Amino acid sequence: MVSTEDFDYNLPEELIAQTPMIERAASRLLVMDHETGALEDKVFYDIIDELNPGDAVVMNNTRVLPARLYGVKPDTGGHEEVLLLNNTHDDEWEVLMKPAKRAKVGTEVVFGDGQLRAIVTKELEHGGRMIEFKYDGIFMQILEALGEMPLPPYIKEKLDDPEMYQTVYAKEPGSAAAPTAGFHWTEELLQKVQDKGIKLVYLTLHVGLGTFRPVSEDNVEDHKMHSEFYRLTEEAAATLNEVKQNGGRIVATGTTSIRTLETIATKFDGEIKADSGWTEIFIKPGYQWKAVDAFITNFHLPKSTLVMLVASFTGRENILNAYQHAVDERYRFFSFGDAMFVK
C-alpha cells in the first residue's frame, strides 16, 4: 500500500507565497537530476541553459475564468456564492455553491442586475451542483463583468492585477485555477528559447479545483481523481513527434501539461496523437512515464496528488529531500512561489 502520509512534509506558513513576483522570470529555480537527486540553486532565467536545441517546451494555454460569482435568490433574498468548476455542456456547469444546503433543485440565483440567472438542475454526490445559466448576450463577456478570480484558499492577499494570475500565453478560457508553473515564463524568455532552436508547443487542459484537494484517504489507491478537459491539436502532435524522432526532449511546463501528454500516450500505446477528451489520470509512484522527458513545476501542497506525480518521476526520497532543501533555503511555495526543473 502507498500511504498518503508518505507524501507529507513540514512547511512553515511564511514560505507560502502570497503575492506574485513582479518580474516573473526572477523567481528561483531548483534544478534536480531525477536519477541522482542532485540539486542546484538557480534563477528561472537560467532555464535557457537547461534546454537544448531540438527540445520542445510544452505549455498549457488555458485561461482562468473569473469563476467566483456572488448572487441573490429572488424568492428569499438569501445570498449564494457560486464557483464554476466545469462547463459540461452548452450553458450547463458543474459548480460549488455556498451555502450548499439551501441550494436545492429548482433554486434560482440572480447575479448583477439580473443579466445572469442560474437554476439548480441537480445535486451531485460530492456536494456540488449542476446549474443552467440563462442570459442575454455573450456569456464570457457577462462573466468577465460579474465574476471574480478564484484564488487558491491559501492565498490571503487580494490581487492587485488579475492578469498576474494568468500565464502570459493564456488564451483558451475554461479553468477554475491557473497552470501555475507557467507563471515564470515571459514573452522575452520564450523568444530566447525559440531563438536557441527549441520548439514551443501549446496544448489546453482546463484546470479544475480538484487540483488543490489534498488526498484525504490513507491509502493513495482509494483517492478518486477529478476529471478535466484536454485538447492537443494535429499541429502540436506533429511537432512533438518530430522532436521525439530527432532525439530531442519533451519538456513539460507544469503538471497539467504532463497529465495531458501522459493521458494521450497511455491511450495510444506510447504514441502522441491529436486528441481531446476528459482525463482522470492519477500519476503516482509505480507509473511508467511514456511521453515527458523533463519538466518545470512549482512546489506543491503536502499530501497532494501533485507531490505524488513528481515523486513518480524522481522517487519519493529524492523529492522529499528536494523539498527539505527548498524549505531550508527559504524558497517560496505553491501557486505564486518558485519553480523546480526536474530532468
Swiss-Prot record:
Listed Pfam families: Queuosine_synth (PF02547)
EC nos: 2.4.99.17
UniProt keyword terms in alphabetical order: Cytoplasm, Queuosine biosynthesis, S-adenosyl-L-methionine, Transferase
Single GO BP term: queuosine biosynthetic process
Keyword Transmembrane helix: no
InterPro entries assigned to the protein according to its UniProt record, in alphabetical order: QueA (IPR003699), QueA_dom1 (IPR042118), QueA_dom2 (IPR042119), QueA_sf (IPR036100)
Reaction it catalyzes: 7-aminomethyl-7-carbaguanosine(34) in tRNA + S-adenosyl-L-methionine = epoxyqueuosine(34) in tRNA + adenine + L-methionine + 2 H(+)
Superkingdom of this protein's organism: Bacteria
This protein's name: S-adenosylmethionine:tRNA ribosyltransferase-isomerase
Organism whose genome encodes this protein: Latilactobacillus sakei subsp. sakei (strain 23K) (Lactobacillus sakei subsp. sakei)
